């Protein structure tokens, strides 16, 4: 059962104090089997209007992406959870306040549908991305991170969790938003859809 996680797995919120672990993960662990995405640093989804900034910046340079990540984490604009096994970082989940992220680069260019790019009256926590170490996939780490995020969102007064899985099956890399099956485990329900993605919600 994928929800029976290993006893040595721990989940921690990303804070400036865990910045070094975050950088180490993206520089040495996250994409060792996918050099195309090496050192991505997951800067596309964050709580700032960075669409024009990132479009003009030389984001093909990993050092530029690294600098943005450091700045965003120190300002609490890039949020989520880090997963550890035996105190070694093995996973990342990007999740943030939906309304705060409507004008970030990822929302505009990756979700890319104006119909759902509207401020919500409800308090909603969005799930944007998962990355798990290649040798740790299939062991329930993404499931554990999502479970923790749901628990915290409810405690923080959020009314819904929202997610954006691909409509069509694709490889694990382009399933970075989490596969549909992951959300079905936690009873996410269809809310609407875009051309390429389902929009799911879970009432908290």
Protein language model features and the residues they cover:
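Conserved N-terminal entry element of GNAT/NAT acetyltransferase domains
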Residues: 2-55
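Conserved beta-hairpin
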Residues: 22, 78-93
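Short, solvent-exposed beta-strand-terminating loops
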Residues: 25-40, 93-105, 152-153
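Active-site rim helix/loop that mediates acceptor-substrate recognition in acyltransferases
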Residues: 40-78
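Conserved acyl-donor/pantetheine-binding loop and adjacent beta-alpha core of acyl/acetyltransferases
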Residues: 71, 75, 88-129, 174-176
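Conserved GNAT acetyl-CoA-binding A-motif
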Residues: 123-127, 137, 153-172
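Conserved acetyl-CoA-binding loop-helix of GNAT-fold acetyltransferases
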Residues: 127-132, 138-154
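Conserved active-site alpha-helix within GNAT-family acetyltransferase domains
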Residues: 155-159, 168-193
């Amino acid at each position: 059962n994928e929800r029976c996680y290993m006893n040595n797995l721990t989940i921690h919120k990303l804070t400036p104090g865990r910045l070094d672990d975050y950088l180490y993960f993206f520089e040495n662990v996250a994409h060792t089997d996918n050099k195309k995405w090496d050192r991505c640093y997951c800067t596309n989804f964050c709580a700032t209007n960075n669409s024009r900034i990132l479009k003009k910046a030389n984001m093909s340079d990993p050092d530029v992406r690294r600098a943005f990540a450091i700045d965003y984490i120190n300002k609490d604009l890039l949020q989520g959870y880090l997963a550890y096994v035996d105190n070694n970082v093995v996973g990342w989940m990007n999740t943030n306040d939906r309304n705060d992220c409507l004008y970030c680069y990822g929302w505009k260019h990756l979700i890319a549908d104006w119909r759902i790019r509207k401020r919500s009256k409800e308090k909603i926590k969005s799930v944007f991305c998962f990355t798990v170490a290649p040798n740790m996939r299939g062991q329930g780490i993404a499931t554990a991170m999502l479970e923790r995020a749901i628990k915290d969102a409810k405690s923080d007064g959020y009314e819904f969790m929202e997610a954006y899985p691909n409509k069509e099956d694709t490889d694990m890399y382009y399933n970075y938003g989490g596969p549909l099956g992951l959300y079905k485990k936690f009873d996410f329900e269809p809310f609407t859809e875009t051309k390429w993605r389902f929009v799911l919600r879970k009432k908290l």
